[in-house]
């Protein structure tokens, strides 16, 4: 077990991912937990890092972005409109508050938003909990190979992270649950065959395109009880404490 340290969210997204990718290409296999901030004791008071966030979005997305950053302890510093339909927002927020926000930001703005952040200062730790991912995950409760029949039925319960014919193990995260709780599922379940074939019972199974996470996106997605597993051949996410077989 080892720890890698750096400064700011930029480190987490760039330096950490570069380090992991380098190790991956050299043949290493490793599991990475959710990034955490480094707090300091200054004159008997616990301090945490804060970052300056500059966001450029369409005006129609301004409210949703501000609503999402509120529970993350971000404080608005400035709002500036270009009078052409876009607005620039400036915030100061604790670094732990924006871990995992970038992927949500892209979803909120439909990929049209621009966000940059830079370390600003160390300040007193903000009281209260930081907002977490609002949805639970679907994770495999059995090892095997995924089948279209099982995935077709699971896609009604959330968004899938993999397609047909993929090897999975117990505890592997296979999708985002539509509700706030985690859901154990069987993505390897096959259709039971019978000797009777009725007209109209066989249908073509159409799977919704699944979400594929990059390393950076996976690191932002996971929560405290989850890990990103990296091998030379794959990037996967899993629940901690589940038996891997």
Predicted feature descriptions by range:
Residues 21-23, 47, 92-96, 103-225, ...:
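Long insertion/accessory domains within large nucleic-acid-processing enzymes
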Residues 45-57:
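Short glycine-/aliphatic-rich beta-strand segments at the starts of folded cytosolic domains
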Residues 13-16, 58-62, 92-99:
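Helix N-cap motif at beta-to-alpha junctions
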Residues 1-11:
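Single conserved hydrophobic/aromatic residue that forms the stacking wall/gate
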Residues 35-36, 75-84, 191:
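Solvent-exposed beta-strand/loop surfaces of large extracellular or lumenal domains
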Residues 56-70, 226:
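Phosphate/diphosphate-binding loops
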